[in-house]
Each structure stands twice: as C-alpha cells, then as structure tokens.
Amino acid sequence: MNRLRAQITRIQTHEGISRILLNYHGQTLTAITLELPSFAKEGSDVYICFKETEVGVAKGNCDNISFSNIFECHIETLNKGVILSTLSATHHSHKIGSIITTTAIERLDLKENDPINFFVKATEVSLEEIV
C-alpha cells in the first residue's frame, strides 16, 4: 500500500459524494469518497493511500489525461516477472510502488532510471487518519 502525507485544503460534498483536495508538497491531489471520514477536516494532515495495483504508468508526454493524481518520477527499481512486474520510484522522499503487467513494461520499454509518470484515479485514493 502506498501512503503519502498530505494536508486537506478543501472539501466539497454534494449528494453524498465528497471531493477532497489535498496539498502534497505544493501539488494538488484529489480523493473522491462516498462517505466522508469523521477525521477529514480542512487544514488537517492525513495519509492518502492507494494500492500498487491502482497505479498506472506512462512514459513520455501525458498532458491530456483524465487522472487527477499525477506523480512525475524516475524508476528506481524494476523487477520483471513472467506475468506481473513491480516498479518503484521516489517522489518528494516518499516511495511509490506500482504493479503492472510485464507486457506493459516491455511495450513501454521501461528501464531503471527512466523518467515516468505515475497516475492514480481520485476514486482509488483513500484517507487515513494520522494519530
């Protein structure tokens, strides 16, 4: 599970759905929730969490994309398996991991130290209270 510390900057709720904007090192990230956690208040620090299997990977220019959460990084580790592969990168001193198909690794011709973008849909982000 990926966990990044961020601060809630804005909460918008309509018809039971909440859009939570978060400041992560000056970058705005978004989480969409069906139930607003009781600890979620504007100005509070939280962990944003998302599974490695929910992290998409792109190489090259990705200006027109619907994903709300984009992390520009360089691949640090790449472990190719027969069907699935894992890769990780550091973004603002936080390790982010991704699990994608080995076919995708080969199609994108990914290698360690390559610049990439990690993508996470806002609906795949959960919040965790910092205690």
Question: How would you name each of these model-derived features?
Answer:
Residues 11-16, 78-84:
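Short, conserved beta-turn/loop elements at beta-strand boundaries and strand-helix junctions
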Residues 10, 77, 88, 117:
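Short, surface-exposed charged micro-motifs
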Residues 2-5, 35-74, 103-131:
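Glycine/charge-rich catalytic "coupling/switch" loops of P-loop NTPases
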Residues 19-25, 30-32, 86-92, 99:
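Short, acidic/hydrophobic/Gly-rich beta-strand patch recurrent on exposed beta strands
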Residues 1-17, 21-28, 56-58, 131:
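Internal alpha/beta loop-helix hairpins
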Residues 90-110:
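Acidic- and glycine-rich mobile interface elements
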Residues 15, 24-26, 50, 82, ...:
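A generic beta-sheet turn/junction motif
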